[in-house]
């Protein structure tokens, strides 16, 4: 990974040795050996140019770093001089870059500085250039010609066997030639990579997976895009293999790459694992720093730094990439800002420890702002009215608030210190209504992180409430005295309240002072006071997160509404579980009223938070918020009653439907039984019908047979009668002529034949 020149340790600066040149490339080559005095060797130290120069600190020599090889293959010119002649590397002063066919390794001359004004350009000609030279000198006369010649001859550079080729382990920044188009290389397989199927080819016995497909599956949500992946590959010195046309066609058909894409690259599994680990490692992300840290590093926004979350801008998150000079400058500025932020953080931690030490000296009863914790930089009389109080703490037990600009070096006796001390809860948190950003909601955070910080703040407030509930068991009583506090003018409010911003013509300084007096007659013990510590939840803690001055940006309303929902639920639970029962509480609730408007308060209104001697804008705002909370509670109760009624109605409907369903199911069962009985009867009837049909057919056949027998008997009887009647006639006719007898016999025979037939 490249680093700025200013950060390279001197151990990596290898002193140049006298070059020993050997060449056997073509006819007409001259082998020149020159000493360090005759030819200027490539300088590796930082150049004396005007801007910051970035170059790679890899060692130049391959094994012993003892000899630098320069092969001159061009003709014509005096090699070895300071001018860029035909066979020497163009590093000298006065002249230009190497001429003709010089085959110079750009790694050897990465930081040359032409003393004559035009030198320093390294040209690569002759068709065997290894890569695009890094032009890091002030005079860049021949850099364009060298880059054009190197890009045109990139195919031959990868297979060049000259001694001046790229050094081992050095990435080649020109596009390598694609894979050879052979059937073995074009055989695609679907392999399993981290639980997903990825297309792969086997090239020269090495399994290579499709880089764009692996990017879509595993890296898309980790980096900005595929260009970032290629930047990482260059930095990791990984050269992906370029697909040939047939492989691209196959990958398009498989859906591994999008239709219309005509190029693709392959990468080995080992290199992909290296790339994946680099993408998932937060300290190695290249590129410019995030936007929120750019504003932090600027000097005019240095006061934002203490409010940023630690870890958002760590030293490793913005590494110098070695690509541009601006990146190096940004990295230096970032390091300075980080160091300053660490100092500020250390000061804050020390101040917090001092605060807790002084708090323990004056009594360990630190109950939710008993140290005159104020709301909106006014007096903390709410806690005096509502919370069991502790023994009075002197104004000397104060600290310097580290988060207020302009108040970092005040003496302990300064009145601002006591005021700032009164803004701190026992667990080290500031009250959410104070006129400065909350430490858990940094100004430089995006809105998504604000939600996270708010949830963390609610969690911390719950812990504080539990501690307060544990301490409330034995509260000592204290006589209250009137307190008048003013905000010091040299601590301007970074975030004024909403009412101050909305009111035309108003200024934040108009509400800087609020005098709040409490009557000396109110000397009752803390046990007789209104029990706002119901279930260990103080009103102060309940309203955490509702003040709009701690919400950055346009998200104020959303977050305030969100927290109001939560707080209304808390108040609802409190009112349901522990109602106000003491007579003192009822009396004080009925007695107090808004003197400015003459309006009596409703019975359940939290009036101990109101003071008739003059309400500041923030107190008015909080009064409005409490009214809104009461309305929200009433609405929630009404909605809950409505929901209960609807539930009851739905339950009754459900029971009715269930009874109706059971009745219908019984009827259905009876119908099914009846149907089964009828079907059985039908089967019996069918069987009886079939038997009767068979009997009928049998009787019909018998009848027909009987009729035929009767007919045959009747025909034989008629024949006998005819024979008896014809016999006398025949005898009478015999006496007649023979002809008549024969005729009669024939007629009789015919008659007999016909009767027998019938």
Swiss-Prot record:
UniProt GO BP: development of primary female sexual characteristics; negative regulation of cell migration; negative regulation of cell proliferation involved in contact inhibition; negative regulation of DNA biosynthetic process; negative regulation of DNA-templated transcription; negative regulation of fibroblast proliferation; negative regulation of transcription by competitive promoter binding; negative regulation of transcription by RNA polymerase II
Name the UniProt record assigns to this protein: Dachshund homolog 1
Quaternary structure annotation from Swiss-Prot or TrEMBL: Interacts with SIX1, SIX6 and EYA3. Interacts with NCOR1 and HDAC3 through its N-terminus. Interacts with SIN3A through its C-terminus. Interacts with SMAD3 and SMAD4.
Gene: DACH1
Description of its domains: The DACHbox-N/DD1 domain forms a structure containing a DNA binding motif similar to that of the forkhead/winged helix domain.
Residue numbers spanned by region Disordered: 1-105, 134-185, 280-302, 358-414, 474-532, 544-564
Entries under Pfam families matching the protein: Ski_Sno_DHD
Biased composition, class Gly residues, residue ranges: 73-102
